[in-house]
Amino acid sequence: MQPTFYVRAKWDEEAGVWYTAETSIRGLVTEAETLEKLRERLMLIIPDFLEEQMPERAVLHILAESADELIREAAE
């Protein structure tokens, strides 16, 4: 079975970026303008970040979290 790395990504409304809020890889921090760009960045930097500790193959599991305010329009 392949090892799995977990990343919880959150949306920062003020900065306009997705960032790594929690991860199973200690010290891994990054951000990107879109969730897809964050995924691409993680796929590139994780092997370099882990160096010799990186297994030959692994699974990257990203849980994305964002919150939006819902406003009910007044009935006419």
Where are these regions (language model features)?
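Short aromatic-glycine-(Arg/Gly/Cys) micro-motifs in beta-strand/loop hairpins
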Residues: 10-25
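Short, charged, surface-exposed hinge/linker loops at domain edges
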Residues: 1-8, 14-15, 36-76
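Short acidic, gly/pro-rich beta-turn/loop elements at beta-sheet edges
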Residues: 17-19, 30, 40
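A short, exposed loop/beta-hairpin motif centered on an aromatic-Gly-Thr core
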Residues: 26-37
